[in-house]
Amino acid sequence: MVVKSALLFVLAAILEIGGAWLVWQGVREHRGLTWVGAGVIALGAYGFVAAFQPDAHFGRVLAAYGGVFVAGSLLWGVVADGFRPDRWDITGAAVCLAGVGLIMYAPR
């Protein structure tokens, strides 16, 4: 269950962050409507991913995904835009990922 859940979180992050990045590129970097359209499709696909999480509670899944989004966004910036996170960015992302672990995988 943990592996499936973690893989779904990674897929969700790629779709959401990637989709938002594509829209950003299309609008802010003037790359055009093709980029925007691809971003909108990716963002729409992201909306379906949470439904496949093994946990049945929408609020829990989306709350935990927020932590993945924080860390994933920083990583995306490093890979795609040459962003260099500082120690506070990294510490904050680590705290968020610890929260993901507690919310999703703590024994109940």
Curated annotation (Swiss-Prot):
It holds the Pfam family UPF0060. One of its GO terms (cellular component) is plasma membrane. It is found in: Cell membrane. The chain crosses the membrane at residues 7-27, 32-52, 61-81, 87-107. Keywords: Cell membrane, Membrane, Transmembrane, Transmembrane helix. Coiled coil: none annotated. It comes from the Bacteria. It is a multi-pass membrane protein. The keyword Lipoprotein does not apply. InterPro entries: UPF0060 (IPR003844). HAMAP family: UPF0060. Belongs to the UPF0060 family. This is UPF0060 membrane protein Mvan_3406.
